[in-house]
Amino acid sequence: MIIRTLGADDAEAYRALMLEAYEAYPQAFTSSVAERAAMPLSWWQKRLDNPLDRLLGGFHGDELAGIVGLAFEPREKARHKVTLFGMYVTKACQLKGLGRRLVEAALDEARQHPRLKVIQLTVTAGNDAAFALYQRCGFIQYGLEPLAVRVGVDYFDKIHMWRELHDR
């Protein structure tokens, strides 16, 4: 499997994979499949070209099989932080190490930016596999956001996690 930065040329594959993710795990994302399906392809292209976001894709052959994003902070006082977001691996490639490789690639990418000190993320409470993966990659829980996401009549909490990017 190959992991690389996605660009505007990957917009169709990125859109298809994220719509699959929103459909399969609606509680894991703050966007809904209906909201994102309504967005034109140009919106997805702009997302991939946004200088404040970096999206990494994991490819199985020519097929995009996993994704993870980094959102850089534009505000001066928070530019030392980056947020890991949009993590998803297709069911066919789950439990094969792609998730860990994507997280490690995101950490490596973040370390290329000297001003960054901290990487943070949220994971839906009850998503034990993702929580354990993040722990194995050095993240620690620092908070719990109750009722963070509503899907239909159900509410889901979000676990907040972080880790330092460099040794002190």
Descriptions of predicted regions:
Residues 120-123, 135, 140-156:
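Conserved catalytic-core motifs of GNAT/GCN5-like acyltransferases
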